Design a protein with these regions (language model features):
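Extended, charged helical/alpha-beta scaffold domains that provide interaction surfaces
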Residues: 1-94
Length: 94
């Protein structure tokens, strides 16, 4: 199965290809290069996500250690949700 080695972003890219670019996905499957393509694109997406996360954390500083635990967890979830939205836009370049 193709999804065994793919992470979250690779799976998202695969679903996007299947749904919005079926001809390209079929060609990659027939060539036998779909897994290599998705792994390479996932590598790109992970780098992009790390860059976006770094920039978001600069723009929205981490709550201080004195803040309660719930605030710190909410901050982490907020950053991750924002990163995921940026990555979903980037997947359209697949």
């Amino acid at each position: 199965m193709v999804n065994l080695k793919l992470g979250k972003y690779g799976v998202w890219a695969k679903k996007y290809l299947e749904e919005y670019k079926p001809f390209k996905f079929s060609r990659l499957v027939m060539d036998g290069s779909v897994m290599d393509y998705l792994l390479e694109f996932e590598y790109h997406l992970k780098g992009y996500a790390n860059l976006v996360e770094f920039e978001l954390k600069q723009k929205f500083p981490v709550p201080s250690e004195n803040e309660n635990f719930v605030e710190q967890v909410n901050y982490i979830y907020m950053i991750q949700e924002m990163v995921d939205e940026f990555v979903k836009d980037e997947i359209k370049l697949v």
